[in-house]
Amino acid sequence: MSKNPGRILIFDTTLRDGEQSPGASLNLEEKLAIAHQLARLGVDVIEAGFPFASPGDFKAVNKIASAVGKEHGPTICGLARASKGDIKACYEAVSPAPKKRIHTFIATSDIHLKHKLKKSRKDVLQIVPEMVNYAKSLVDDIEFSCEDASRSDPDFLYEVIQLAISAGATTINIPDTVGFTTPSEFGNLIADINKNVPNIDEAVISVHGHNDLGLAVANFLEAVKNGARQLECTINGIGERAGNASLEELVMALHVRKSFFNSFFKRNPDSPTPLTAIRTEEITKTSRLVSNLTGMTVQPNKAIVGANAFAHESGIHQDGVLKNRLTYEIIDAKTVGLSDNKISLGKLSGRSAVRARLEEMGYDLSREDLNDAFARFKDLADRKREITDRDLEAIVSEQVQLPEAKFQLSLVQVSCGNASKPTATISLLNTEDNTEDTAVSIGTGPVDAVCEALNKLAKVPNELIEFSVKSVTEGIDALGEVTIRIRRDNKIYSGHSADTDVVVAAANAYINALNRLVFSEKKNSIHPQFDNLENSNNTYISNPAN
C-alpha cells in the first residue's frame, strides 16, 4: 500500500493547469490574490506555475513562494519537465517558501514517446532516475508524474514509478492526461500500481485528470477507494479543453459522503474527522474570485458553486424544502459559504467599517488597495441603496485586475435610442507614453459602438467572440457583471468588469481583455507539454525576476 497521510491531500493547480484554459491568463497581482485565497481555503499544495515558461511565470511563482508560503501554510510547488534547466528554474522560483516542492514529469505512453518526445522507453528509463535524483539534490519534496499514464503500458509504468521512487520521489502522480479512462479502469490502475510497484509504500499516490468525458471527479473518487491520497484539481474545474477535476465537487463529495469513504481510511463509518483540510465555508468566495479574475463564467447548473445549485423551481420541491430543507437538499448552502448577508453600510460609512467587513470576509488589503477599494465603495454607495457582500467581492475583484494595464478608460459616453444610431465617445489613456486620445464610433448597439471606438484607439486587432452580462445581486440598482472574450491568432483573452452601468462595465471589460492580450504577447510563454526537453537543458533564465 502506498504511503498513507491518513487523509486526502488537496493539490490545487488552478494557477498552472487552470490558467492554461483558453482566455484564462492572469497577471501577477491576480495570481497572488488567488494564491492567498487558496491558502485561506486550506489547500495542502499550491502548484503556482511553470517557472521555466517565461520571466513572468518565474516571477509569479517566486512571489507566491515568498508571500504565501508559510511554515504552517500550503506547500508551494512549481512544474518542471524532466530536464536540468527546468528543474533548476523551478527550484530557484520556489526557494523562498518554507515548504517547497518540485513537480517534474515525463510522458510514459508510447504515443507521446513516439510523436511528441521522439524518445524510446530506454531513454525514459535513463532520464527519470537522473532527473529525479537531481531534483532531490535541491529539495526534499519531489513529485514525479507519468504523463498520459492511463494510456501507458502497465508493466512499463510500474518500472518507471519504481525508478522514480528509488531516486527520491515522495509523491507519484498518475495523470489521466486526455480524460480517456473510466472510473473502474482508473480505480484498477491505482490498485495495480499498489500491487506491482515494490517500493510504492515510500510515496504518496496522487491523481490528476481531465474532464473530456465528464468523468474526472468519478475517476478520482474511485482512485481514492483504491489508495490514492492526493487529488490534483482546480477551482471551478477550469483547465485545458473540458477542464480538470473540480476541487469543490471532490471536497464536498468527500464531506457529504464521509461515512461511505471513511472505511477506505480504516476509520469507523461515523468518525467525525474530516477527510480533507479544506475550510468549506471558503468555497463559494474562492469560486467567485477565480471566475471574476479569469473571466470564465460558472455555468448556472454547476454542482456546488453554480447559481442554481441551491435553487428549487418545482412547487413540490419548494414545499418540501420549506418544511424541511433535507427533503431536497443534501448540503446546507452555508457549509460552502453561500450567504445573502447584507451590510448596513452606506455613503456615510467610514473606511474603518468597510475595512472591518472586508477582513471578516477574509480580505487582507494593503493600505493603498484599501483606499482604492473604499473609493469604489463610496462611488457605488452613491448609486445603490444596499451594499451586499457580493458587491464588495466585485469591488475587490475589480481592483485586483488593475495592475499591468497598458490601457485605462478615461471617458465613456453613449447616445442611443429607437430613433437614433448608437454612438459612443471614448477617451483612452495609454499608460506607456501617458497620452490620451478620443474616438467616436457608431455601432449596431451601444456596446458595439463602444468596442468599435476602443479598437480605433487601441489599434490591437482582435475578434469579439463572446459578450455576456448578469446582475450581481437583485434589484434595479444592482451591479451588472460583464464578461467579454476576444480572439487573436487563435488565442482567447477574457475581460471582466462590474458597474451599475452595464455599458461602462462593458467598456472596462473590453479594456481588461485588451490588456491581457498585450501582456500575454509580451510574456511569450512556452507550454510544458508542447516543447521538446532539449529546449530547456541549455537555456535557463537565471533570476528573471530581477
From Swiss-Prot:
Its cofactor is Mn(2+). One of its GO terms (molecular function) is 2-isopropylmalate synthase activity. The keyword Manganese applies. Residues 8-271 form the Pyruvate carboxyltransferase domain. One of its GO terms (cellular component) is cytoplasm. GO terms for biological process: L-leucine biosynthetic process. Residues 408-546 are annotated as: Regulatory domain. It is an enzyme of class 2 (transferase). Disulfide bonds: none annotated. It is found in: Cytoplasm. Pathway: Amino-acid biosynthesis; L-leucine biosynthesis; L-leucine from 3-methyl-2-oxobutanoate: step 1/4. SUPFAM superfamilies: 2-isopropylmalate synthase LeuA, allosteric (dimerisation) domain (SSF110921), Aldolase (SSF51569). Its EC number is 2.3.3.13. Keywords: Amino-acid biosynthesis, Branched-chain amino acid biosynthesis, Cytoplasm, Leucine biosynthesis, Manganese, Metal-binding, Transferase. PANTHER family: 2-ISOPROPYLMALATE SYNTHASE 1, CHLOROPLASTIC-RELATED (PTHR10277:SF9), HOMOCITRATE SYNTHASE-RELATED (PTHR10277). Homodimer. Belongs to the alpha-IPM synthase/homocitrate synthase family. LeuA type 1 subfamily. HAMAP family: LeuA_type1. Catalyzes the condensation of the acetyl group of acetyl-CoA with 3-methyl-2-oxobutanoate (2-ketoisovalerate) to form 3-carboxy-3-hydroxy-4-methylpentanoate (2-isopropylmalate). This is 2-isopropylmalate synthase. The gene is leuA.
